[in-house]
Curated annotation (Swiss-Prot):
Record protein name field: Protein FAM83A
Source taxon at top rank: Eukaryota
Species annotation: Xenopus tropicalis
Main location: cytoplasm
Record key words, sorted: Cytoplasm
Bias-annotated ranges (Low complexity): 328-354
Gene name, Swiss-Prot/TrEMBL: fam83a
Compartments, as annotated in UniProt: Cytoplasm
Amino acid sequence: MNKSKTFGKIKKRIEEAKNKWARLSKADYSYNESARLATDALLDGGVEDYQKVLSEEGEVDLLSGDELQYILKNIKAPLYSNDNQTEGENGSAANGNKSESYYPMNSDSEPVPTLHNWSAEEKPYLKDKSSATVYFQADKTNNVRETIRRCINKTTQALAILMDEFTDAEIFCDVLEAANKRNIFVYLLLDANKLHLFIQMCEKLQVRDLHMTNISVRSVTGDVYCAKSGKKFAGQINEKFIISDWRFVLSGTYSFTWLSGQVHRNFLYKFSGDVVELFDEEFRNLYASSKPVMGLKSPAPMAPVLRREDSGMSIMSDSNPESINTTSEPFSSISTASISNDSQRPKSPVSTTPVPSPPSSPVKSPLQRVNSFHGYSSLISPPPQINYQSNYYQRNYAPDPPSFFYNNNANFYRSFRMRQEDFSMPRFNQGWRLFSRATMT
């Protein structure tokens, strides 16, 4: 038997690399069948069968001790069991799914709504110039943890977070304040394997679903490896990034843990411009395969509507004066457009009876204020409604003295009808009677 046949693909390359005089072989990126056979044996029979297959294939040990424990801990049985198997007409066993393959359409869970695809006009990240900035943990002037916290605190509309581990209570407080105090909708995707750490933190802080009115917490896994027997295990989420207002991205090695902010060395990238589209697409794909955990289960996409806060703080930037006038509060203040346009002022007589105010529309929820991140559009103050223009200028007047209209220059709004006090005034002045009749000379 040729000795080279007893060597697996990886073992052969290692032996050639150790031999200085061996001929350099061409790089091979093809599929390794020995690795698949060994992994299937690990799922079906355990470590002993795994080592046996490696020995038969002449391959090196592919997995570390931690990787072996991870696979053994996360093995999932196939969707069917022996109890559900029935014997067919030809004596072969058949399961209820008619196939050993996994059919997502047979799932009992509700499907995640199809995510909206951006149009060229709606992509907010295309409005900014493409740039990239790097932050290192050793740079004390631009601390990585503080950079992330500033990003959360400066977000004004929506925040999308994909994280492997979330146990930092201070960052979690920033997220809660953004959602509950500033009405920012937060999409939080967490790794399913470390989700229990996040739930434990919420239990310690006594945070429940009722405190997450604007937060959607969902779990997601990595890719799934499935053996021929149907047993499988899922990978972890090692991607970590934050999308703020769909305009820039923070990504790197940083995890939302206390150790990452204090002792672990990490780096952080900040991207803006066209590259944000890649992160947006990745987040939407992961969101579609995620499962609800806490907070809102399935936020319905609604058109964005601006809302005036009770504290007077707008959800937009303080430099935008249009954000204080909304369609939900048409009587909150006079719009700028209606003041500058004199042609829309009412010419009908002003009534002295109180004008009943129409019932204001209910306060819009954050789901109505901020669309699902898949259907984002720029928040622009809606134009003033013409139906309300007359109500803006109807005032309740008290009877004015007769001298008011002679000493005040603002009586051009006065009605042409005679008011009651006008009849008590003389129609003609005595000083002008000499011009009432023509004189003959």
